[in-house]
């Protein structure tokens, strides 16, 4: 994975009021931290970061160029946490974690199902199990997502984490027996729906 350059500046003011002013200017408050550096408050260009998230995903490897106090610093980092407005969905705060290219790190990556399952062609329904798995790799080997081919799955068959093939240098940490995808019959889905409906119904109250 190639590092994406993001230019940020030192943030002299912290607190809610200062953060609101930044957002009105199209900027975001953020922080850089890691094992070998002190916490560093920064100002992030919102539009540029949104573009990186849209094209590279939240597991993007970043080269942060920090300016301020008459000097420039560079950090290799990953996005550790993204905060968004609960209603509007826009970014409100971002945490960056400094990494070493020689040290492995853990990350949660999305699982994307690819292909039309054989069982679906036979009248079954494909059900998605877990949508994310935990992995470990060097920063340069960190994938944006794990793509899994499900075209071979027939009715009644499933695919587990232990059967996934990952790129070289990537180790899966999630439990191997965790189900990624299953092809079930239409009747099985109908039965499950009926059971959920029955469970959700309240018993009739006797008339007074």
From Swiss-Prot:
Part of the 50S ribosomal subunit; part of the 5S rRNA/L5/L18/L25 subcomplex. Contacts the 5S rRNA. Binds to the 5S rRNA independently of L5 and L18. GO terms for molecular function: 5S rRNA binding; structural constituent of ribosome. The keyword Repeat does not apply. Keywords: Ribonucleoprotein, Ribosomal protein, RNA-binding, rRNA-binding. Residues 188-208 are annotated as: Disordered. Belongs to the bacterial ribosomal protein bL25 family. CTC subfamily. CDD domains: Ribosomal_L25_TL5_CTC. InterPro entries: Rbsml_bL25/Gln-tRNA_synth_N, Ribosomal_bL25/Gln-tRNA_synth, Ribosomal_bL25_b-dom, Ribosomal_bL25_C, Ribosomal_bL25_long, Ribosomal_L25_dom, Ribosomal_uL5_bac-type. This is one of the proteins that binds to the 5S RNA in the ribosome where it forms part of the central protuberance. This is Large ribosomal subunit protein bL25. GO terms for cellular component: cytosolic large ribosomal subunit. The keyword Repeat does not apply.
